[in-house]
Amino acid sequence: MAPGLYTDIGKKTRDLLYRDYGTHHKFTLTTCTPEGVTITAAGTRKNESVFGELQTQLKNKKLTVDVKANSESDLLTTVTVDEFGTPGLKSILSLVVPDQRSGKLELQYLHEYAGINASVGLNSNPMVNLSGVFGSKELSVGVDVAFDTATSNFTKYNAALSLTNSDLIASLHLNNHGDTLIASYYHLVKHHSNTAVGAELSHSFSRNESTLIFGSQHSLDPHTTVKARFNNYGMASALVQHEWRPKSLITISGEVDTKAIEKSTKVGLSLVLKH
């Protein structure tokens, strides 16, 4: 089985510790037409700011066209072609209007023992990104680099290692030009209840600072999941998510600084409806 892409390394742990948490209020409505067009409208309020987004997606065999407009007058168009000329190869073309320098062409290739991702900006002095993962589903190593052709400098070079078995995933990342080391693990404790625990330790060598975060999740029933996390700075978060119909979810999350409970409590609400 393919090892996946570089962004897949440590993804299970990141989803456990960060996905669906939030202190904002968000409403999302999705509807699908008989012609295969998916329309999604979303509104988000955080503090005093309100952000809106309207997305239209059309799928036709191997071609997907995605057009997204937001309340900041940005228009993002993404065209994706699966199996682009050969099995395992995907091409992605994206452009944000009115930013004329935002165009980007990306190629993704998945092989039994490798996952390659390459992208280049569509402008006169493009940024070139290249990442690769080599190995198997059980053991893989990866690199991720970015080169700025305008300055002829490498702006990013990261490396990662992943170990996976049936219920345990461990990963190690070296980021920020070798300044940040991140170790993480994910353990699926009980399959039938989707009970899992995980942790992430991040250390900055230049600042000599470390951040440690623990998290867990458990399914109360097939439609209801609870999650919790806590870090070494005393920040605690929890959420409950309920799916009352397929892909329609309500999520209530909270965050508190245990060192200043009376001042720091925040509550977020997310409602996703799919028709």
UniProtKB/Swiss-Prot annotation:
It comes from the Eukaryota. CDD domains: Porin3_VDAC (cd07306). GO terms for molecular function: porin activity; voltage-gated monoatomic anion channel activity. InterPro entries: Porin_dom_sf, Porin_Euk, Porin_Euk/Tom40. Highly expressed in flowers and at lower levels in roots and leaves. Induction: Not induced by osmotic stress. It is found in: Mitochondrion outer membrane. Gene3D superfamilies: Porin. Consists mainly of membrane-spanning sided beta-sheets. Forms a channel through the mitochondrial outer membrane that allows diffusion of small hydrophilic molecules. The channel adopts an open conformation at low or zero membrane potential and a closed conformation at potentials above 30-40 mV. The open state has a weak anion selectivity whereas the closed state is cation-selective. Belongs to the eukaryotic mitochondrial porin (TC 1.B.8.1) family. This is Mitochondrial outer membrane protein porin 3. It comes from Oryza sativa subsp. japonica (Rice). The gene is VDAC3.
